[in-house]
Amino acid sequence: MLILISPAKTLDYQSPLATERYTQPELLDHSQQLIREARKLSAPQIGKLMSISDKLADLNATRFHDWQPDFTPKNARQAILAFKGDVYTGLQAEEFSEADFDFAQQHLRMLSGLYGVLRPLDLMQPYRLEMGIRLENAKGKDLYQFWGDIITEKLNDALKAQGDNIVINLASDEYYRSVKPKKLNAEIIKPVFLDEKKGKFKVISFYAKKARGLMSRYIIENRLTKPEQLTAFNSEGYFFDGDASEKGELVFKRHEQ
């Protein structure tokens, strides 16, 4: 079973590390190509491209400039401990045991605009480059064209290594678009999280993102290997709705808090 999640814009390079172990990202040659393109942009151009403030544009221009391909614990941090968004609030990797990190390293992948695919313990230097950004490059007009089949091939390698063919898609649509489902040697299962509001169940972005992290944590902590085991997920009040689910899509609901 391979879990896919999105990265986060918010980063943490300060808090204590839950593990000293680390690995190197596997697609750094490609990352370097993107860094070369990003360095051509001025801070105002970055601000316009990413729709961010002048302050954030300056920060990310500096990050692109400072980025170097030799990753060490001094200039980089394990990806699963560096990302700090809603998904990662649910995941709570800072509480993982070494055995949890072992399982996650094999079964969890973070999709990334700059790094393509990251394993949890892969070192990562700080960056902001969302998958949907239209950064022109040698391969085309955006990052989807840049990555092409590369991300899908890397995921197929991971599935082959674990002798499995189940992908749990907990990534956002923006990031999952970088995967080619028809070329993925897997059965793809997408959990959907609906929260009740005024008597109706719907996707509420903040809650859904956190729930993707909660589900990832549930799989990792319980060492799940079969998709049917996901239906027992009940973190923070969610419950499986078999009637609303269909092939390839598992629906979880939660009553209004």
Swiss-Prot record:
Domain of life: Bacteria
GO terms for biological process, alphabetical: response to hydroperoxide
Pfam families, alphabetized: H2O2_YaaD
One cellular-component annotation, GO: cytosol
InterPro entries named in the record: YaaA
Family, similarity comment: Belongs to the UPF0246 family.
UniProt cross-references to NCBIfam families, sorted A to Z: PRK02101.1-1, PRK02101.1-3
Database matches in PANTHER family: PEROXIDE STRESS RESISTANCE PROTEIN YAAA, PEROXIDE STRESS RESPONSE PROTEIN YAAA
Protein name: UPF0246 protein Ent638_0568
